[in-house]
Amino acid sequence: MTTALFSPSNRRKRRLTHFFFTVLAFILLAAFIYGHDFISFSRRSLHSPTIVHQSAIVVVVDEPPPPPPTSPPPPSPPPPSPPPPSPPPPSPPPPAFAVGKTPEGCDVFKGNWVKDWSTRPLYRESECPYIQPQLTCRTHGRPDSDYQSWRWRPDSCSLPSFNATVMLESLRGKKMMFVGDSLNRGMYVSLICLLHSQIPENSKSMDTFGSLTVFSLKDYNATIEFYWAPFLLESNSDNATVHRVSDRIVRKGSINKHGRHWRGADIVVFNTYLWWRTGFKMKILEGSFKDEKKRIVEMESEDAYRMALKTMVKWVKKNMDPLKTRVFFATMSPTHYKGEDWGGEQGKNCYNQTTPIQDMNHWPSDCSKTLMKVIGEELDQRAEFPVTVLNITQLSGYRKDAHTSIYKKQWSPLTKEQLANPASYSDCIHWCLPGLQDTWNELFFAKLFYP
């Protein structure tokens, strides 16, 4: 018996039994210690998502993992500051020769005539040897001199005083030209009379070469010139002394024949008007005066005048520098042949008139408002090369007293009938010097130096 109990087989069984009870005891002890957690885990497992174990990787099948915590977005940068305002465009350079500026709203061409013996006349007729005998009224017997005493006073500002020294200094090394008809020649002579007393006798001279008259200022290396071109364009009236042609013909677009004499001028003053007022259509030559068979067409005065101004502006743009030169255009000079225009007797004219017209609304009947409109349209101040308009028309229209009338050199002997009726040969186109045209030059001075 003893042998059987301690046989190797029994000894193995006892060891297995001992091991079994040891494991069982361990399980029971663990169950006691972790029983609560085990129960909680078991309950949780019934509701937990299925987890697949693969090596050391855990994959959640039915729910994505919560996103990783993110940092709060950085604060938005402040809105950019608005760009600084663009600087204003640079002001255009002042016109050539300008030394100042006319006040805003000042129209020197609107005003009235006031008598002023303290400052008028600006020179004496006898002191200026350059006045043509057609304009020396006192020398030719005019009994009154009141026409010399009137000063133009603008309504809203004052007119700068004419300063011969300023004008002469501005002309150093320069060339000034007046281009047009006999009315522009009168303005040219007036300017020379306003300047000549400031120039030494041996340093000035005047010479005429056909259509061109040149006043030389040797100490200033300067010239003031006049060029006869009553239409500005080439015409059959271009002879400076023999131009009384009844059948006037103007060559279309032909400015270069005259224009070659104007090149190099620093200041140009144009005028043209009276010669276009024929009462008929204008004859316009298409081609050359040298053509054996001439093609001539007729145009209304308005259309022909517009053509001339367009051609003038085209020449200016091509030949003048807007930064270094200045161009002016004097509007129409009125005549006074109809006394009824100012409330006078019918059949009377400027003869024996000694005072200006007082009606400030007066407009000279011979001055075409249609042609004035053409001037305004073609000489636009906003153009690439602005032409300064000297609007002398209305202010001159008041001056029925300032014409040469009968007090001038007569080129032909007067008949008995004319002598018996002085009004019949009275010149109501041209103006006595000194007189109205000195005012034109005061206005020219203002616009040249104070634009």
UniProtKB/Swiss-Prot annotation:
Annotated Gene Ontology cellular component terms: Golgi apparatus; Golgi membrane; Golgi trans cisterna
Cystine pairs: none
Pfam families noted in UniProt: PC-Esterase, PMR5N
Membrane topology reported for the UniProt record: Single-pass type II membrane protein
Protein name: Protein trichome birefringence-like 32
Miscellaneous: Contains 2 motifs that are conserved in esterases, but it is unlikely that this protein belongs to the catalytically active pectin esterases.
Motif interval(s): DCXHWCLPGXXDXWN motif: 427-441
Residue intervals passing through the bilayer: 19-39
Keyword Transmembrane helix part of the UniProt annotation: yes
Family: Belongs to the PC-esterase family. TBL subfamily.
InterPro entries named among the record's database cross-references: TBL (IPR029962), TBL_C (IPR026057), TBL_N (IPR025846)
Any one GO molecular function term: xylan O-acetyltransferase activity
Ranges of biased composition (kind: Pro residues): 63-96
Keywords, in A-Z order: Golgi apparatus, Membrane, Signal-anchor, Transmembrane, Transmembrane helix
Residues in compartment: Lumenal: 40-451
